[in-house]
Amino acid sequence: MTYRLEFDARALKEWQKLGDTVRLQFKKKLAQVIINPRVEANRLHSLPDCYKIKLRSSGYRLVYQVIEQEVTVFVVAVDKRERELDYRKAEDRLG
């Protein structure tokens, strides 16, 4: 089953600010995520039904929430991996 991909409005703005290379890397990972969104190794324990995608080379993270009743992968935050800012943004937006 393939999940639908949606963005929080603020996450979409963050996405649009990314460079082309970083965006392409995330697109490749998201293509895998919409097929199999629940990867246990990427689960965030502090946020319910949330998972992360890490781009180690560029230092970016993307946080998404799996919404089963809507069969949706919902992107909550995209940001640099600095002082856990990406996780704090996700927590505030889901809060």
Predicted regions and their residues:
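Short, conserved clusters of charged catalytic residues that mark active-site
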Residues: 10, 25, 45-48
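A short, surface-exposed loop/turn module that caps and links secondary-structure elements
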Residues: 31-55
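Solvent-exposed, charged interface segments at domain starts and junctions
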Residues: 1-2, 41
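Enriched for short, Lys/Arg-rich terminal
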Residues: 2-4, 12-13, 17, 24, ...
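Compact soluble domain cores
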Residues: 21-33
